[in-house]
Design a protein with these regions (language model features):
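Cofactor-binding active-site loop characterized by glycine-rich and histidine/acidic residues
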Residues: 49, 53-195
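Cofactor-/ligand-binding subdomain signature composed of acidic, glycine-rich
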Residues: 2-69
Length: 195
C-alpha cells in the first residue's frame, strides 16, 4: 500500500514538474516577445535610421518629429502579448474565446499594435493579399525579415507610409479612433449588441 502511494506521488510530482517546466519555457518566450514588440514600437516612434543599432546612435538617427506615445505603447504591448498567449493556450478548450474584440483606446499607441501585427505576420499577409489599388498606394515590402521590418519602422508616420493611428488599412480595424472615449462607447455598443 505504501509503495503504491509513493508511486502515485512520484507520478504526480513528475507531471507537476513537466507543467512547471512548460510554463517556465512559455513565460520565457513571452518575455522575449514583449521585449521585441517594445523595441519595434520604440523604433517606429523615435528612429529614422540605424534601426538595428548596428553602430552607436547619433543625433541624426533620431526623428525630429515624434508621432505617438511610448508610455501607451508599452501598456498595449503588455496587454496584447499576454492576451494572445492566453488565447493561444485556451481557445481549443473554450471556443467562445474566438469572439473577443480588441479595442485600442489610446490611438497614439498604434506603433504597439502595428509591431504586434508585424510579428504575428498579419501585416505581410494582409498587404500581400490586397487588390492592385491598395498595392499601388502601399508599394513596399512587408516580408517577415530585416528588409520588411526596416520598411515598417522607416515608413511609420511618413506621408506615403503607415498612419500614426489605426486606419482602414490596418488589418482588423473597423474604425479609426484616437481617444479613449471612442473605444469605451464602441465597447458599450458591442456589449449591448451581444446580450
Amino acid at each position: 500500500m505504501i509503495k503504491k502511494t509513493l508511486n502515485k506521488n512520484k507520478k504526480k510530482t513528475s507531471l507537476k514538474n513537466k507543467i512547471i517546466k512548460k510554463s517556465n519555457q512559455d513565460f520565457s518566450a513571452l518575455k522575449k516577445y514583449l521585449r521585441v514588440v517594445n523595441f519595434i514600437a520604440a523604433a517606429q516612434l523615435y528612429l529614422k535610421d540605424n534601426f538595428f543599432l548596428e553602430r552607436e546612435l547619433r543625433s541624426e538617427d533620431i526623428k525630429t518629429r515624434l508621432l505617438g506615445h511610448w508610455g501607451g505603447a508599452t501598456g498595449v504591448n503588455f496587454l496584447l502579448s499576454h492576451l494572445n498567449f492566453y488565447l493561444k493556450e485556451n481557445q481549443k478548450t473554450n471556443p467562445k474565446l474566438r469572439d473577443i474584440i480588441f479595442l485600442l483606446g489610446p490611438g497614439h499607441a498604434f506603433p504597439a499594435l502595428q509591431a504586434n501585427l508585424f510579428l504575428e505576420k498579419t501585416l505581410s499577409f494582409y498587404f500581400d493579399n490586397q487588390d492592385k489599388n491598395i498595392k499601388n498606394i502601399y508599394d513596399f515590402n512587408l516580408s517577415y525579415n530585416k528588409e520588411g521590418l526596416t520598411h515598417l519602422i522607416k515608413n511609420f508616420g511618413s506621408p506615403a507610409g503607415f498612419p500614426t493611428h489605426a486606419s482602414p488599412v490596418t488589418p482588423g480595424a473597423i474604425l479609426e479612433g484616437g481617444e479613449l472615449g471612442y473605444s469605451i462607447s464602441n465597447a458599450s455598443g458591442a456589449v449591448m449588441d451581444n446580450k
